[in-house]
Amino acid sequence: MTRCVSRAIATRSHLLVQAGTGTGKSLAYLVPAMVHAVEAGERAVVSTATLALQRQVLIKDAPLAADAVERTTGVRPSVALLKGWQNYLCRHRLAGGYPDDDSDTLFSAAEATPRARVGEGTEQSLGEQVVRVREWAADTETGDRDDLVPGVSDRAWAQVSVTGAECLGTSCPLHDECFPVLARAAAAEADVVVTNHAMLGIAAAGNPGVLPEHEVLVVDEAHELADRVRSQGTVSLSATAVARVAATARRHAGVVVTDLEEAGQNLQLALAELPDGRLTEGLPPALADALTLLEAACRQVLTDVREAAKAAGPASASGDAGAVALARTAVADMTDVVERMTSDSVAQRRDVAWVERPRLGAEPPRLTLSPIDVAGSVADALLADRAAVLTSATLALGGSFNPMAATLGLTLADADWEGVDVGTPFDYARQGILYTPTHLPRPGMGISEAALEEVVALAEASRGGMLGLFSSRRAAEEAAGVLRERTGLTVYAQGEDRLPTLVEAFAADEDACLVGTLSLWQGVDVPGRTCRLVVIDRIPFPRPDDPVSQARSEAVTAAGGNGFMTVSATHAALLLAQGAGRLVRRADDRGVVAVLDPRLRTARYGAFLARSMPPLWPTRDRDVVLGALGRLAAGQ
């Protein structure tokens, strides 16, 4: 892998590398990237999807790689960490330069940080959490939220941070001590910058300045990149959001917001007349008219807020500057969202739009827009004019790199690309069994009684040690209930506690079961006997009513391709590979992956899905599987 990465960097080409767990892929891309940086003076950006891998790269792997490069070249490469602006403490806000924010950030792009976070501070009140942050602020050298352990809630952190747009910049009296400014200065001088996929998503959405200049891009956990980029490009709007922005502008900038409030009410009326679901024919006339009125109102309020900002003057001269900056950012962000919604992006099939009503509470309906295809923006903003290495344990779907290459924009980029599978240190056929019980019925709307009985039989044979991956929360809850009712096993269920707490408890008990949904399919690393059985209730196709998948499939079909295989089957293959990959995490792991969906064996697309999974020994024989699980449970 190191040779392949070195060649891609030297030739400024693009490389997909499938490297299984245990191959040491972090060192395999860090060393050649660092050598190139110190010899050619060209910076590399390394991006991860999860906080866990980001920490591993920064704290463990990068120092090891730097040691090796220094011994070889005589020069030690420098490494810097870069995150989104709001992930850093704002000294000026802490000192009272901004008013307390009593509402959530509404329209800024999703914060550029992996979502997994250790500790949310839920045991403490908001005030207690803020006090703890203030005490930590006196000693921190980085201001990085993730250095605060245990962590605090998003609401508490919002009291001590700002977005990049809300920052007062050089007008701030504490600009020279600003944590995000210092982080960006360090990144601009470093040989290697470690960041995350959310930052890449912001760059792909039209803000390349969030990243320092770089000639080499390395994307680890690359199978998640397209979804992260799409997430950054997804925006929502509701009457409640409009009302909150209006209140922010009135409170912090003192401007008149009557027209904006009325436009928000008109939006609510227009959305209330529409059913939930995708707007397949574009925006209905009444909704389009409501958005046009809202756009005009936003622009007027934005003009007024900007005038208020001029009157407030620089932060050093007025305590109002921070408050007005909050108002300006809220209105400007909403204006950008509304302008996108009133553009022709839906009619031109660049975006897909849908109406949805929150499941809980009395929130009004909201309108959401999401990009249909992100391959072009990835190719243009992230891959063009630089070497790129994209790696993951799951890139060759159905035995081919072509599906992921198309999804990630490599087929559109101006450079040559190749896919390389460097293999795995594991002997999957000896270490694990892939069990597909073809006697079960084809899955319907929910999980069947027969499938629940199979879950119980497998868990009892294994005497626990089961990770259950289910396609819906309801199915996971039913499985947890049945396991508790019919077995004496300890069962941990997603939603009953914080996910890190549940995973930690599961890892500590060899005979427990952990069941959940999508959050458990990727990133759960529990080696050893604790996870000797992975149960997947059905092939994880996208929901039939998912607007983005529908629109993507239609676009592929319209272009002459196979929409089902390109979108739905590829989505399912990726998740199956990730889910099955939870079983074997080290060379002495053994166990069973059970997919309770006969379509994996009987459907025409089943072979494509099976080839995407680790090459476990396949069987349909229930007795063989139950016997193997019994021996594993007995420690044989």
Residue ranges and their predicted role:
Residues 1-18:
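Conserved pre-motif I regulatory segment
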Residues 6-10, 26-40, 60-64:
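Walker A/P-loop NTP-binding motif
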Residues 425, 437-446, 497-601:
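Conserved RecA-like P-loop NTPase helicase motor core
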Residues 437-471:
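Conserved interdomain hinge at the start of the Helicase C-terminal
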